Amino acid sequence: MITVRISFEKKNEASYISLLDMQRVMQRVLKRSGLPVWHTLGFNPHIYMTFACPLSLGQESQCECVDVKTEAENPDFAQWQTALNAIMPAGIEVYRVEPLKMKADAIAYACYRIRYPADAAEKLAQYNALDSVPVEKKSKRGVRTVSYTHLRAHETCADL
């Protein structure tokens, strides 16, 4: 039994699939594909899967990964990719299937590209220029106004 990493991209309407729904999608796709995946032992067996660094709802991705254990000794990774892409929902495409080289918790960082409106740099500069950013904090004792200015990072916008 080996662990296989399935790398996929999530675009357009698929970006609104939450992590729990994505788990259900992957389970259904793997079941329908007929690929030899390993199931947990127990009263209600399910496919063993691990998602590495899942994204928040509404974010598109070019590289998301799910690790799956397989019962096959030497799986044909090209056949896995073809079988999965044939039944994937619109907006999700598997672009690589390979044996696991490093565990999901070994990922140290991720690179994000975020697109903002044209006036975002100006609004961010205005925000950074503020001396204080009052925030209402609710507690058992009531509502009080605090400033977390000393905790915020200095944000910048860069043109790429």
Regions found by a protein language model. Give the residues of each.
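A contiguous pocket-lining binding segment that forms or flanks enzyme active sites
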Residues: 115-117, 125-138
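Short, extreme N-terminal leader segments that mark the start of a protein/domain
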Residues: 1-28, 32-35
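Short, charge-patterned binding micro-sites
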Residues: 38-68
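Conserved small/polar residues in nucleotide/adenosyl-binding loops
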Residues: 149-156
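Short, intrinsically disordered, mixed-charge
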Residues: 22-36, 82-90, 129-132
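Ordered, amphipathic secondary-structure segments that act as subunit-interaction surfaces
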Residues: 62-113
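Long, contiguous binding/interaction regions
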Residues: 137-147
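Short glycine-/aliphatic-rich beta-strand segments at the starts of folded cytosolic domains
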Residues: 6-8, 110-115
